[in-house]
């Protein structure tokens, strides 16, 4: 066991997570069609503050993230402060760590709490796959800049005459890694082939995710942590996530064709997480501040870790790398955990990470550790379903996982929970949570 790193303030206070909330998650171009991420962020933070009944002036910092950036609102965090009635002097800045963005936001607020610069803050993220920054070609962009500097109409017309019809076509946001040109699904296919993850195994995990998420909603387990969203023109509210297929059968998954490697692939739209719109946020404060305000925390942040690996091959192994580090810093092992919640970007990626967490060879030869991190107990793993079912608004997923895990830990009488995710760029994140 390596060095334990307690997450406490100089006064010995633990980092308390006192409340968490999210919007329902909606598939791209459905319920939240036309609503930008900044509005989703305002929606969830405003409701979170209203439900918590914490005076706005108590919140000293807001750290928020957005992966699909909109040029007109580059600092989503500050726009949320200004648009929710929070104290105008509240410090606010934005972060981005791809699919682990709200993990990063939580870590940043925790670090401010430990440094003593604040006593309470909000962390979270929002993304919209329905409101996208549609760009223009590089040639058109250059011409537009030059036209802006041209002094006469003839100069402007001459510049425009250089353009061809193809130069006027809109350019959608990139779906591939900037450094490699690989799509996430291509990497998932790599992992499936390298580690022998079959189509049947992937479909089974996806089906399990949907069934458990549907059961969680049916049992009323999510009602406290998911707000009702009222959407213009306000005819019908969105109450639940609209991606969950509770009535599907395993046979339904087998009907879909591969989405990335059309000829030999096993990754399909059904065993991958869909493009999604939504927002989520949590309130963090020092343990003593929570006591002063008479608040009972959902739980505490015990440790966190971020890692990075090469992007050319199997880059979605973030959980396999970050989990042992987070556990080490918490002074725990896999067997100490009550719950394990892993982001399901793809069923193939999830199953490959589970495989490596239990691999002695990977631990010795790749991580340089004496023993495997540990086998993942299925009875503890993604017990309420995962991202394949709920959806994945990139910057919001981490806050969803944290809130969901803490509520479930409390229902079980407390314990330790691990939340972990892969992210674009070969990044990984893991956090250990504690509930009493």
Swiss-Prot record:
Q: Name one GO molecular function term.
A: acetyl-CoA C-acyltransferase activity
Q: What is its main location?
A: cytoplasm
Cell compartment(s), UniProt: Cytoplasm
Q: Does the record bear Lipid metabolism in its keywords?
A: yes
**CDD domains listed in its UniProt record:** thiolase
Database matches in InterPro entries? Ac-CoA_C-AcTrfase_FadI, Thiolase, Thiolase-like, Thiolase_acyl_enz_int_AS, Thiolase_AS, Thiolase_C, Thiolase_CS, Thiolase_N
Q: What class of enzyme is it?
A: transferase
| Keywords annotated in UniProt | Acyltransferase, Cytoplasm, Fatty acid metabolism, Lipid degradation, Lipid metabolism, Transferase
**Which Pfam families does the entry link to?**
Thiolase_C, Thiolase_N
Identify which residues the record assigns to the active site: 99, 392, 422
> Which domain of life does the protein's organism represent?
Bacteria
Q: Can you list the GO cellular component terms from the UniProt entry?
A: cytosol
The reaction(s) annotated as catalysed by this protein in its Swiss-Prot or TrEMBL entry are: an acyl-CoA + acetyl-CoA = a 3-oxoacyl-CoA + CoA
- What pathway, per the record? Lipid metabolism; fatty acid beta-oxidation
Task: Fetch the Gene3D superfamilies from UniProt.
Answer: 3.40.47.10
- EC numbers, comma separated: 2.3.1.16
Q: Which GO terms describe its biological process?
A: fatty acid beta-oxidation
HAMAP family for the chain: FadI
Q: What does this protein do?
A: Catalyzes the final step of fatty acid oxidation in which acetyl-CoA is released and the CoA ester of a fatty acid two carbons shorter is formed.
Assembly information from the UniProt record = Heterotetramer of two alpha chains (FadJ) and two beta chains (FadI).
Family the UniProt entry places it in: Belongs to the thiolase-like superfamily. Thiolase family.
- PANTHER family reported for this sequence: ACETYL-COA ACETYLTRANSFERASE, CYTOSOLIC, ACETYL-COA C-ACYLTRANSFERASE
Q: What is this protein called?
A: 3-ketoacyl-CoA thiolase
Ranked from the top, the taxonomy reads:
Bacteria, Pseudomonadati, Pseudomonadota, Gammaproteobacteria, Enterobacterales
Q: Which gene encodes it?
A: fadI
